[in-house]
Every structure is written in C-alpha cells, then in structure tokens.
C-alpha cells in the first residue's frame, strides 16, 4: 500500500506529471463520448484536416469524398451519430465550396491530419477518421503542454491548472484548431516568463527560438503576434551593452536604446509578417474574414465602448454569464455547459495555484513584475481592439 501511495505522492509533487495524467484520462473520455462533429465548427475542421490528409492544399474550390462531405453537412440536420461501418470511397468525390477553416495555415491542423491519415491506413470510415483525428490532437496538446510546464521556471502550477480547464481539454479532444492556438499561447507565455526570470545574457539559441516562435504565432492566428508585445519590456541585463558590441560603429553605440534588444525584436516582427505573407501567397486569397469590410466599427469607432459596456459591464445583458462560464466549460457551440457552481472550485484552484510559488526562482522576476503586469494588461487591450476592428 505504501508503494502505491508513494507513487501517487510523486505524481502530485510534479505538476507536469499530474497534468499529463489528467489530460490524457479526461481527454480520451471526451474524445470517445462527446458526439462526433458536435464541437464548435468541428465539421469545418474535419473537412480541412481530411483534405490535408489526402495531400490537397486547396483554397477556392475544394474536393472531398462524397461520404466525407455528406457527413460534415449532416451536422446541420442534427445528425451527430458516429459511423464506423461505411468505408470512404476516395474516388467518389465532390468539388465545391471550401470549408471556413481552409484559410488556416496547415500547421493548425497538423495533428488531426496525421490522425486521419493513420485511420485511413486501417479502416477509412468517417467515424474512425474523426476519432483518430481527435486522439492525435489530444496527444499533441497533452505532450506539448507537458514539456512547456517542464520548461517554464515560474508558475508551473498555474500552467497546469489552466491547461486542465474543462474547455481546454474539450477543445484538445476534438478536431478544433484551437488546440494548436492554445499551445502557441502557452509557449510564448512560458518563453516570456523564462526571459524575465533569467539572470544571464540572452543566448544565441534563445534568439533563434524567439524568431521561430514569432513565425509560429503568426501562422496560428495572426492576432497572436500581439503576444510578442511584452518582450518590449525585457530587462537590460539580458543584452550586451552597446559599448561592448565591437562590430557596431561607434556612432550607433551612442544610441539610447539597446541595439541587440531592438534588432532582435524588430527581427521577430519581420519574421511574423513574412510568415503571414508567405502563407497568404501560397493560399492565394486574403486570410481575413469576408465580413471585415462591413465591420460597423469602421464607420463609427466610438461604438467600441458601447460594445464593451454591453458585453462586460451592463448587468442587464446575459453575455457576462456566457463569457465567465464559457472560459471554464461552455461546450459544443454553446449547446450545453457545466453547472454554474463549478466555477467556484475552479477559481479556488486557480487561486491556490497562484499562491504555490518558489521565491528562489522568482527572485530575478520580482523587480519586473509591475512592468510585466502593465505589458500584459496592454496586450489584452490590444487583443480586444484588434479582434473588434480587424477580424
């Protein structure tokens, strides 16, 4: 008995192990039991993933097997039952309008595509391809966040709790591309915290990693590029002073800003922009939604404040409940959700995770907490503005 208890204790002591165990257990349950294609826009992500699994990168007119196209469309008629019997005839195809998920870069559907490809090797039915795509997405999310928790220096328990929120597992155990987006957000957040808590100079491999992450963020969702904003406030100790940069002309060495820091940040921004432009060139069409030109805020920008009031503040509106509860467990296109009382233990657990701190590891971060907090709040405001005005 003591042997098994010691294993449980060792599991709980390491947040990354606890995350991986719970994520896989509840994720598999969700992947199997949640009705297929019932998750928000899952049928669109299924069409995109299946097309990529067939090796087709299409943008304007897309070709799918008729069985796959019919299965995706049957959701609108209320059919969410899985079909494991009828095999997909890949030669009996239909060409028509592409799914709304086609504008995403292929990296957003890479795990689902691999799962569908493997399913086609065994028994190419719609039921099995959807299930394998879900499981592959879950594995990618769980393993990625596991390594991110291992890697981040501070806030490991916060990463664990947020990564295990019911909505996060629900999306990861589906064909949704939001799992990839969530991994990207976890990654840049961990990278930012590691840099702020680092006492030594920035290493070359970290600079390369930053450039790669910048491109990755842009390819998930373009608005994620705003997550690079807190890096503008990185402490000076990470960078070599201008006077010690031997290859830099003396005129530039007298600049008030750190050349190494701003060269890296400008480079990260250029990589993000280049990644977007390259994908748009490959895709052959605009990546913004078709409704963007008709955005009412373009005609009256002051409506932005009215929308904010009616969304977050006005007590007579029902959106507050959707937003707060939706962040925890509003599932499947808002058709069903967790009971409201679940919010209380969820927020309590998040609070406990915030209190679980290691002062030794946070020592280098402490002088910059105010600066980082301002940067994060500003980033959130930029997100709201970007989504409201551009998307």
Predicted region positions:
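Short acidic/glycine- and proline-prone juxtamembrane loop motifs at membrane-interface regions
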Residues: 174-181
